[in-house]
């Protein structure tokens, strides 16, 4: 390194996994015959179409395709529901345009002869669909860029593997399934070896899809595992997260197995999705590090996280099941607190120098990464713009200390979100109303459901 040369912040290769010209060549050679074009919906699931590869190149890549706008206005079961301003029976359930982002082209090794691109959504006049998760994140990243920073993000998804097919799991009402491990295999090389054929295939095929694989390890709940990927720019990471989550399920199904990312499958440890974030400045340096510690930028950014955390919890924990993770002593947070390498806090500061970053420990495996990262960026920008002071860290057990509490139910989180002036200022009234309605729809469905717990409690004895 020559004198005066900047030390670059290490990031993953940003070269698109598959270029347009390379795709043309693969299609001409007959190696690719199908292209998936998909966008993340409100739950972070990929929705879209499969195209003949030649038609995709000749028509769709330049002009886009259409999709019914109800795809951002349905419940998790794809039922039409009331309350969304952008899409309804009264508005005729028209279309929006799905426009491929060429930078997201990649092969899908688990689907023979298949490539994929992620789409952005636009209305007929070309204006973006504001409630689309990818657009929500783009808007916050543009705001961050206005301050001279880019967000570097990594997500850590946990999942539980079962030796049952998805079809059997459905028929069994998702009860009585056989986990791939019989006991806690956290960090166990022996225990994870039993699931290694599946985990190895997932790792290798994700690498073939352009993701940079780091490692895999066992977790605490029987059958629970985690595969880690290298961090990257925020939008790239969120796209990769969505591809990985879908692809892992497809690969498991092909192997006659199933896996779940739901936040709390049973009364044991839940599936987390800790999100790590750092900021890079225009020179590629870690803007959060200064003089062997945290910079003022990081302190303000982290202070913003604390101020907004309760009001933005809907973005980090979007479902009823999400809130069942938040139990004392569970490694899932209950306290709105931060600490140095302290896993009892909602916000954990880790790393040193150029690797210095913070981790938000609220999200579970059911998180929509686009919305969660948008929330992290918006909260941090509030801290920077208001120059918020960071309180002292929690030095011990945040579970038993006197801190504000993470919301304990989706209902509480939805009310905080709906009444948040900070959320409305950062995201706009349309987005706040849209995702408040998403929570209302889920709450109404749950309130009307008769649960197994009620049957066991009341069938004979009441």
Swiss-Prot record:
Q: Which UniProt keywords apply?
A: ATP-binding, Ligase, Magnesium, Metal-binding, Nucleotide-binding
Q: What happens when the gene is disrupted?
A: Strongly delayed growth on defined Evans agar supplemented with 25 mM ethanolamine as the sole nitrogen source. Growth defects showing no mycelial growth, only swollen and sporadic germinating spores in cells grown in defined liquid Evans medium supplemented with ethanolamine as the sole nitrogen source, but normal growth when supplemented with ammonium. Inhibited growth in complex medium supplemented with 25 mM ethanolamine as unable to utilize ethanolamine from the medium.
Q: Which GO terms describe its biological process?
A: ethanolamine catabolic process; glutamate metabolic process; glutamine biosynthetic process; response to carbon starvation; response to nitrate starvation
What PROSITE patterns has UniProt attached to this entry?
Answer: GS_BETA_GRASP (PS51986), GS_CATALYTIC (PS51987)
- What activity regulation does UniProt give? Very slightly decreased activity with glutamine synthetase (GS) inhibitor methionine sulfoximine (MSO).
Q: Write out the residues that bind Mg(2+) 1.
A: 156, 274, 359
Q: What is its EC number?
A: 6.3.1.-
Biotechnology remark: Modifying the binding affinity of this protein via protein engineering could make it prefer ethylamine as a substrate instead of ethanolamine, resulting in efficacious and sustainable synthesis of theanine, a major aromatic compound of tea, highly valued for its beneficial properties.
Taking every annotated instance into account, which residue ranges of this chain make up the domain GS catalytic? 133-462
Please give the Gene Ontology molecular function terms for this protein: acid-ammonia (or amide) ligase activity; ATP binding; glutamine synthetase activity; ligase activity; magnesium ion binding
From the record, give the transmembrane residue ranges. Answer: none
Q: Which cofactor does it need?
A: Mg(2+)
> By its UniProt entry, which PANTHER family does this protein fall under?
GAMMA-GLUTAMYLPUTRESCINE SYNTHETASE, TYPE-1 GLUTAMINE SYNTHETASE 2
Family in the record? Belongs to the glutamine synthetase family.
Q: What is this protein called?
A: Gamma-glutamylethanolamide synthetase GlnA4
The record lists the organism as Streptomyces coelicolor (strain ATCC BAA-471 / A3(2) / M145)
Instruction: Give me the gene this protein comes from.
Output: glnA4
């Amino acid at each position: 390194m020559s004198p005066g040369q900047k030390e670059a912040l290490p990031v993953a290769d940003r070269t698109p996994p598959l270029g347009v010209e390379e795709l043309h060549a693969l299609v001409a050679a007959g190696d690719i015959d199908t292209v998936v074009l998909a966008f993340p919906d409100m739950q972070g699931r990929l929705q879209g179409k499969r195209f003949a590869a030649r038609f995709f190149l000749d028509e769709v890549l330049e002009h886009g395709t259409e999709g019914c706008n109800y795809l951002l206005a349905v419940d998790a079961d794809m039922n039409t529901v009331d309350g969304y301003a952008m899409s309804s029976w009264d508005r005729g359930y028209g279309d929006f345009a799905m426009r491929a982002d060429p930078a997201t082209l990649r092969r899908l090794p688990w689907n023979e002869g298949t490539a994929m691109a992620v789409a952005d959504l636009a209305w007929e006049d070309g204006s973006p669909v504001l409630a689309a998760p990818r657009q929500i994140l783009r808007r916050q990243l543009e705001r961050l860029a206005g301050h001279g920073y880019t967000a570097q993000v990594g997500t850590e998804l946990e999942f539980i593997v079962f030796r049952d097919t998805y079809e059997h799991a459905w028929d069994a009402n998702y009860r009585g399934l056989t986990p791939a491990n019989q006991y806690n295999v956290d960090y166990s090389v022996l225990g994870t070896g039993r699931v290694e054929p599946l985990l190895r295939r997932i790792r290798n095929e994700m690498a073939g899809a352009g993701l940079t694989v780091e490692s895999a390890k066992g977790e605490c709940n029987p059958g629970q595992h985690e595969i880690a990927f290298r961090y990257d720019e925020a939008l790239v990471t969120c796209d990769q997260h969505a591809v990985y989550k879908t692809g892992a399920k497809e690969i498991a199904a092909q192997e006659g197995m199933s896996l779940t990312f739901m936040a709390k499958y049973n009364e044991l440890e839940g599936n987390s999705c800790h999100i790590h974030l750092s900021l890079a400045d225009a020179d590629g340096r870690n803007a959060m590090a200064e003089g062997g510690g945290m910079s003022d930028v990081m302190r303000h950014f982290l202070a913003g996280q604390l101020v907004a955390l309760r009001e933005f919890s809907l973005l980090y924990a979007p479902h009823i099941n999400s809130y069942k993770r938040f139990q004392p002593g569970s490694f899932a947070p209950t306290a709105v607190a931060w600490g140095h390498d302290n896993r009892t806090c909602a916000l954990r500061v880790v790393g040193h120098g150029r690797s210095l970053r913070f981790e938000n420990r609220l999200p579970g495996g059911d998180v929509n990464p686009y919305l969660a990262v948008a929330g992290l960026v918006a909260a941090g920008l509030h801290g920077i713009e208001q120059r918020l002071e960071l309180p002292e860290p929690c030095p011990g057990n945040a579970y038993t200390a006197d801190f504000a509490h993470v919301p304990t139910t989706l209902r509480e989180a939805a009310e905080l979100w709906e009444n948040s002036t900070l959320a409305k200022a950062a995201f706009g009234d349309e987005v706040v109303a849209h995702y408040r309605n998403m929570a209302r729809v889920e709450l109404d469905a749950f309130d009307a459901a008769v649960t197994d717990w009620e049957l066991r409690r009341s069938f004979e004895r009441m």
